[in-house]
């Protein structure tokens, strides 16, 4: 009889920080001229997948028939002075334009010869279904967006340039002169 060894994978697991899962956006009409970019001062992102199921009663019990999966992505950020992306996204909602969305996990770089700035991720296309700009006397202006996704998206390797990573969060900077 062969002895089977089991490992507790949690001993080797490492949690992914929320700051390392970034979302980039672009209006599909601008794909030829504009790179995807992050929202400035993002405080929260969320991706929800749901599926309704119809129930059919039989003599032997209920049979469930699943429907199509629905995907929704939300983003919340603090409004940055001069932010053009928020304006573009609001205009895209008003004009029913398709928005491209990339979800990239900066903790999972793709490795290989000649591969740089690629990370495991997902690609989506959809419409903005809700846009909210909230301002009160004590806090910064907050923008919340909800995207209704066409289909369920697709896994792939997402290019996130160093500049885009810097926009998403601080990236290590060395002590040497930058040339600026």
Question: Model-found features: residue ranges?
Answer:
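Intrinsically disordered, low-complexity terminal/linker regions enriched in Pro/Ser/Gly
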Residues: 157-180
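Solvent-exposed edge beta-strands and adjacent loop segments
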Residues: 12-78, 125-141
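Short beta-strand and beta-hairpin "edge-sheet" elements
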Residues: 45, 104-155
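Structured, beta-strand-rich domain cores
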Residues: 62-121
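Intrinsically disordered, low-complexity acidic/polar segments
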Residues: 82-84, 154-157
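N-terminal leader/targeting segments
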Residues: 1-13
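Glycine-rich loops and low-complexity Gly/Arg-rich segments
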Residues: 50, 98-103, 149-155, 170-174
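Short, low-complexity, polar/charged sequence segments that are solvent-exposed and flexible
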Residues: 92-98, 121, 145-149, 165-169
């Amino acid at each position: 009889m062969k002895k089977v060894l089991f490992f507790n994978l949690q001993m080797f697991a490492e949690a992914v920080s929320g700051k390392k899962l970034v979302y980039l956006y672009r209006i599909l009409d601008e794909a030829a001229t504009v790179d995807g970019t992050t929202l400035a001062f993002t405080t929260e992102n969320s991706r929800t997948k749901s599926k309704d199921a119809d129930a059919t009663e039989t003599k032997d019990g209920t049979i469930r028939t699943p429907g199509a999966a629905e995907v929704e992505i939300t983003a919340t950020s603090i409004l940055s002075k001069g932010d053009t992306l928020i304006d573009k996204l609001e205009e895209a909602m008003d004009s029913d334009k398709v928005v491209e969305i990339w979800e990239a996990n900066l903790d999972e770089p793709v490795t290989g010869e000649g591969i740089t700035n690629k990370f495991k991720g997902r690609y989506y296309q959809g419409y903005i279904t809700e846009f909210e700009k909230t301002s009160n006397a004590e806090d910064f202006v907050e923008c919340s967006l909800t995207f209704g996704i066409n289909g369920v998206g697709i896994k792939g390797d997402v290019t996130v340039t160093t500049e885009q990573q810097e926009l998403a969060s601080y990236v290590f900077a060395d002590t040497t002169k930058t040339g600026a």
